[in-house]
Amino acid sequence: MEEINKTPKQIVAALDNYVIGQNQAKKAVAIALRNRYRRMELSAEMQEEITPKNMLMIGPTGVGKTEIARRLAKIVHAPFVKVEATKFTEVGYVGRDVESMVRDLVDVAIEMEKQQAYSGVRAQAVQAADKRLVKLLVPAQKKQAKNNGNEFQNMMNMFSQMQNGQTPNVDDSSNEEVTDEVRNQRLSVADQLKTGRLENSEVTIEMDDPQQAAAGNNNMLGQMGIDLGDSLGALMPKKRIQRTMPVSEAREILVREESEKLVNNADIYHDAIVRAENTGIIFIDEIDKITKGGQQGSGEVSREGVQRDILPIVEGSQISTKYGPINTDHILFIASGAFAESKPSDLIAELQGRFPIRVELDDLSKDDFVKILTEPKNALIKQYIALIGTDNIKVTFTIEAIEAIATIAYKVNHETQNIGARRLHTILEKLLEELLYEGPDMEMGEVTITESYVNERIGNIAQDKDLSRYIL
C-alpha cells in the first residue's frame, strides 16, 4: 500500500529522471496510478464498482511509450508485463493465446512475492547455506548404509514436501562419520567463511537443473494454466546436476534453496495473485498492427479475431493459471502503437471503448535529443563514459559535440525512417567505434569528443542520404 501511495506530482518527478518530455503521457499514467490508491481507500463494495481507466498511447517508435510504462511499474513496485499484439493468434490457431499475457503477469508477481519472502528469512537461510558449504568444503566419510526401516518414511516425507511445492529437506548429517580431525577442520573453515577469506575458492555443489526448469515453463499445457511439471513433480523428483563454482556464487544458490524451505508457497501464490489483480500492469505494444488498416497478407490469421480475444480480458474476466484463478477486472492495461498506416478508430468499437484515455506522444526535437543524451539518471553519454572508463580512458564530451550529435540524429530521423531516441544508439556506436575497439591498447588517458571529432567521423555519412540510410 505504501508503495503506491504517491501523488501524481511525485510520480511525474520520478519519471522525469528517466524519460525526457512527454508531459501529457506522464500526467495520464500518474493519475491512473493515483486512482488505484484512491480505490483501495474506499469500502469493499465501492472498490468492486471502480475499474481502472485503460490507456492508449499513440506515437512513433522511440519516443518513450514503453519506457514510461516500464519505469512506472518500477516506481510503484507493480508486476509488469510487456507483450506484442502481433505475437498472438486467434483462438483455434497454433500460437500464443491472449490469456498467456495474464499468466505471465502472475509469474512476475510470484517472483516479486518470493523475493520479498526470501528477504525476510535471508539471515536464517545464509546460516543454513554456510553450514552446507562447510560440509561440502570438508566432506566426511559416509556411514555404511543400513536398512533400518526409515527409508520408506523418508521417501514419504520427501513426497509430501514436493507435493506442497517445497524443496525436499534432505539432511544427511546423520549418515556422516565425523572424526575429531574433520570437526576441527570444519570449525576452521566456518571461521574463514565468516571473514570472507574463501569467497573465491572453488566448491562443487548439487543443484536443480536449470534446463529442466526452463523446459517445464515452455510447454503448451503451461499456457493453458496446467503445469505438467508440478503435476508430475511429486512422482518424478527434480533432476539434480553437479557444478563447480566459486563459494560466493554457490552461497547464493544454496541460500535460495534454503529460503524455499523456510517460506510457505501457498501464501506466496495467494499474495501474488492478489498483487497482480490489484496492482498489475499489462503493456500491449503494436496494437495498431492488428487493426483493419494494418498491413495484412491474404494468408494471415485474422487480426480482428485477436482483437475480439483481447476484449474479454480487458473488460474483466477470470483466467485459469497453475497457481489459481485470477480476475482481470482491476488490472491496468496500457496499449500503444505508432498508428502510421492506420488510426485508433480502425480498432473494433468494443475495444476502443475499453481504452477511454488516449494520449498522443510528441515527436522528438533536437533539444529533446540533447536532453536525452545528458539529463536522465543513466543517460547514454554517461553509459559510454563508464564503459570506456573500464579501459582507464577518461572520455569527455563538449557541449558543441553533444549538440552536433543531436542535430545529426534529428536530421537522419527526418530524412530516412524516424526511430526516435533509438537513433542515438546507432550514432554513438559509430562515433565511438574506434575508441571501443582500440581502447584496451591505447596509452593516452584522456579523450575529448569535440564537434570536429563528431563531424569528422559521422558528418559525411549523415550528409549522404543513401549512406545514412544503411549506416546510421
Curated annotation (Swiss-Prot):
Belongs to the ClpX chaperone family. HslU subfamily. ATP binds at residues 20, 62-67, 285, 350, 422. One of its GO terms (molecular function) is proteasome-activating activity. GO terms for biological process: protein unfolding; proteolysis involved in protein catabolic process. A double ring-shaped homohexamer of HslV is capped on each side by a ring-shaped HslU homohexamer. The assembly of the HslU/HslV complex is dependent on binding of ATP. Signal peptide: none annotated. It comes from the Bacteria. Keywords: ATP-binding, Chaperone, Cytoplasm, Nucleotide-binding. Gene3D superfamilies: 1.10.8.60, P-loop containing nucleotide triphosphate hydrolases. It comes from Lactiplantibacillus plantarum (strain ATCC BAA-793 / NCIMB 8826 / WCFS1). The keyword Cytoplasm applies. HAMAP family: HslU. This is ATP-dependent protease ATPase subunit HslU. InterPro entries: AAA+_ATPase, ATP-dep_Clp_protease_ClpX, ATPase_AAA_core, Clp_ATPase_C, HslU, P-loop_NTPase. The gene is hslU. Its main location: cytoplasm. ATPase subunit of a proteasome-like degradation complex; this subunit has chaperone activity. The binding of ATP and its subsequent hydrolysis by HslU are essential for unfolding of protein substrates subsequently hydrolyzed by HslV. HslU recognizes the N-terminal part of its protein substrates and unfolds these before they are guided to HslV for hydrolysis. GO terms for cellular component: HslUV protease complex. The lineage of its organism: Bacteria, Bacillati, Bacillota, Bacilli, Lactobacillales. Pfam families: AAA, AAA_2. NCBIfam families: hslU, PRK05201.1. It is found in: Cytoplasm.
